[in-house]
């Protein structure tokens, strides 16, 4: 890569592999909005963040860097992201990234990986992320994951929706289908206030829960008509 307009950064293979895992499931696959068929990589100051969206959901993750760097935003193609995820190791060995407005270079171990970038304008992700949700619910990731997996069994394959009903002290998870079959589970939670009944695509929730590693997750809620 040419040294002109180049931003270089260094972090561990494990750190970057983890960042990719936290968002890559939300990338579009064959969207006519070609800039969605990839992942936005942003370097700003001492932070690196990655963002992916398919127009229905958005995933965002960030990591602190050891130094202050010039700002740059690039869109990595979907194939590049998937290949990097496959090649990077779960270790603390160094990964060197060099970015220009048209190319990205990744060096790790004996591998030197160069990719063209997607030329396009990624959506303003910061506007999409809710800032005013004032209701916070903390949940066991594993408990919620298992409940959603069971509820999914009775959802329609084409429209796999579940309802999450938050009320005082409990969360009801309801899955049903066109045959009028219904599955319902209840989890004890620390929630008080007006009941909130929200519908979600269960696969979107499972994608999140299968890719985060924390034992506890936080859910920020507005009302039944708001994103979460």
Q: Where on the chain are the PLM-derived regions?
A:
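Structural preference for solvent-exposed beta-strand-turn elements
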Residues: 1-228
